[in-house]
Amino acid sequence: SGTTGMPKGVKKPLIEAPWPQNIPIFQAAQLRYQFDTETVYLSPAPLYHAAPLGFNMNTLRYGGTTVIMEHYDSEEALKLIEQHKVTHSQWVPTMFVRMLKLPEVVRTQYDVSSQRIAIHAAAPCPIAIKEQMINWWGPVISEYYAGTEGNGSTTITSEEWLEHKGSVGRAANDCILHILD
């Protein structure tokens, strides 16, 4: 991605299975995030990044609907959640910070209660920011850490995180973690 050095391209092999066949990595995300035909996914991040592109494709794979923002705007995102009754979304911590900086009268005028899962990733989220988001949106925040290369991931729900603030969660998708100092 170029966030920590020279931009790189990650060439992944094409999946040779027919479209409707369940692929383990897609099925794992579907089970974790409960994608189904009732899913309405808000994509506030650019599709040239692997994560938003992948989540959009997975939503469509399981019969859901995607709402793609042309560019990120905090109030517009809240408006879209209410307008489309968004059930799933994906964010980076900077977006949380920007939404929390909106005047309270703006934040509270939109109904965001349709959300079942608000996924966040890409960078560590400050504890105070994540606490404020969970207080505002409820325990729908789900965090994951992973790499474009597909070399493993961790995931944590709001409930787990509130018990272990700052944790990155547990290994996901049969991944084996090695913690080194």
Indicate residue ranges for each PLM-predicted region.
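Thr-Gly-centered strand-to-loop micro-motif
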Residues: 43-44, 68-69, 119-121, 180-181
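Gly/Ser/Thr-rich phosphate-binding loop
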Residues: 1, 61, 86-91, 100-164, ...
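Conserved AMP-binding A3 loop
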Residues: 1-21
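Short beta->alpha linker loops
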Residues: 72-73, 94, 124
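Active-site phosphate/pyrophosphate- and oxyanion-stabilizing loops and adjacent acidic/basic residues
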Residues: 27, 97, 131
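Conserved AMP-binding/adenylation subdomain of ANL enzymes
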Residues: 15-40, 44, 48-88, 102
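Short Gly/Pro-enriched turn/cap motifs at secondary-structure boundaries
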Residues: 165-171
